[in-house]
């Protein structure tokens, strides 16, 4: 019969944890896996040769951070020292990503309240503006007149409504805007109803991205297209999303 040991002891013996207290914390937080099975009892005994892995914590406070990180990497965008404006901040995934990438400050704007992650609410670099509708964003509502980088992740509204309201806050001479394009909120009511909220037609998705890109270039003569890409992560309901980047001349 194979020897068996407590799960917390196995983690320490395999150097997956430094102490039994740390091992217990990993187990109780649900991060210890055997294949796809989550092991949550520190004192339960298992065979010495059981396969164990530690699930790494997410890099950012929400999935949105991974979306922005992919765009920054693809287009080699440096946010070090940048002053960020996050429109539709919600939990703060974009803000968290930007700060970890070196942004100096972040102003978070959201029409809701009590959504920003506690980690970001406590960060002195972050200004949290709640119950503020970006469609009617006045300069007096913000701590700065312009920003080095503006990121946008909004739902249930078209970017054609948000972009004109936000573009004035992008700094001239190289300011950056990155917007998450969500086809389900850009398509016509007929297409959305037909698709039951999840746009699966790739031709329609691509056409929507092209339409938003053309809109931005038409409305903002001082905009230069950086590029666009598929989001590495789909929306909550499986919707394909895109990231679109512009610079202000």
Which functions belong to the PLM regions below?
Residues 80-90:
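Conserved class I S-adenosyl-L-methionine
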Residues 160-178:
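A short glycine-rich, Lys/Arg-flanked "PGG" loop and its adjoining helix->strand segment in the class I
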Residues 91-102:
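Conserved SAM-binding loop of SAM-dependent methyltransferases across substrates and taxa
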Residues 233-249:
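Core SAM-dependent methyltransferase catalytic element
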Residues 16, 73-80, 143:
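Glycine-rich helix-loop-beta junction characteristic of Rossmann-like nucleotide cofactor-binding loops
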Residues 183-201:
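Short, glycine-/aromatic-enriched active-site segment of Class I SAM-dependent methyltransferases
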Residues 107-161:
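S-adenosyl-L-methionine
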Residues 1-50:
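A basic, amphipathic helix-loop patch mediating RNA/tRNA/ribosome contacts
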């Amino acid at each position: 019969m194979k020897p068996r040991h407590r799960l917390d002891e196995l983690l320490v013996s395999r150097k997956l944890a430094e102490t039994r207290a740390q091992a217990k914390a990993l187990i109780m937080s649900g991060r210890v896996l055997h294949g796809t099975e989550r092991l949550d009892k520190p004192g339960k005994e298992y065979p010495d040769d059981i396969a164990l892995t530690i699930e790494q914590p997410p890099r950012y406070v929400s999935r949105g951070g991974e979306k922005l990180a992919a765009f920054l990497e693809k287009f080699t965008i440096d946010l070090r020292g940048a002053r960020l404006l996050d429109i539709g901040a919600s939990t703060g995934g974009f803000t968290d990503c930007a700060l970890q990438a070196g942004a100096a400050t972040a102003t978070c704007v959201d029409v809701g309240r009590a959504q920003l992650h506690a980690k970001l609410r406590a960060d002195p670099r972050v200004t949290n503006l709640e119950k503020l509708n970006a469609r009617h964003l006045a300069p007096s509502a913000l701590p700065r007149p312009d920003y080095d980088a503006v990121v946008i992740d909004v739902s249930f509204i078209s970017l054609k409504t948000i972009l004109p309201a936000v573009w004035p806050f992008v700094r001239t001479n190289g300011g950056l805007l990155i917007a998450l394009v969500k086809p389900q909120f850009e398509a016509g009511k007929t297409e959305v109803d037909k698709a039951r909220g999840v746009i699966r037609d790739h031709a329609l998705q691509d056409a929507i991205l092209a339409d938003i890109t053309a809109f931005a270039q038409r409305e903002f003569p001082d905009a230069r297209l950086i590029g666009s890409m598929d989001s590495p992560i789909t929306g909550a309901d499986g919707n394909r999303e895109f990231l679109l980047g512009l610079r202000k001349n």
